[in-house]
């Protein structure tokens, strides 16, 4: 059986989120891990852009989860073994969880540091918690852990999609195109 495509709405949400999550992840990584502390102006600028675009992920993942809760995804092609089907669905669930927890912990962290969370240069998200010098770094660690886990799974997801297309030459990637 050739796989059927996902409907337009989940395909658009998938690619829109990819177009936001990948640069947001890279900006956070560069600002947090590559730039030296002495480059505070550049770090501040990159983290500002990171927050602007990453905050929209909260809205998009809620829309995506709502769609997923009310619509069944198409079946994978018959050529995909059962163990890979189970693994794909389990990893998809974990990725959904991380796409929710990563921006939420970022939002919580910003709130705990007393910073506003801008959304696409048009507004701000309300603080989720009050300022807390004690909680902010702990939430920051949770945000970093969640972001790293999401980054690893995203990389694996991309590699798996490319292996399906160019290695196995099946129609799995076509489902989301």
List each language-model region with its residue ranges.
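Membrane-embedded alpha-helical bundles that constitute the cytochrome b-like, heme-associated redox core
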Residues: 1-177
């Amino acid at each position: 059986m050739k796989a059927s495509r996902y409907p337009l709405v989940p395909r658009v949400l998938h690619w829109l989120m990819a177009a936001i999550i990948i640069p947001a992840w890279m900006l956070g990584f560069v600002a947090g891990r590559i730039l030296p502390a002495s480059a505070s102006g550049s770090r501040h600028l990159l983290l500002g852009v990171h927050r602007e675009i990453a905050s929209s992920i909260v809205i998009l993942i809620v829309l995506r989860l709502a769609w997923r809760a009310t619509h069944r995804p198409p079946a994978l092609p018959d050529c995909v073994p059962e163990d890979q089907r189970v693994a794909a669905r389990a990893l998809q669930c974990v990725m959904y969880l991380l796409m929710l927890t990563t921006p939420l912990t970022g939002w919580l962290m910003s709130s705990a540091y007393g910073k506003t969370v801008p959304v696409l240069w048009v507004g701000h998200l309300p603080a989720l918690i009050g300022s807390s010098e004690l909680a902010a770094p702990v939430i920051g660690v949770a945000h970093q852990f969640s972001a790293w886990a999401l980054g690893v799974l995203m990389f694996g997801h991309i590699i798996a999609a490319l292996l399906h297309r160019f290695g196995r030459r099946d129609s799995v990637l076509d489902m989301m195109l």
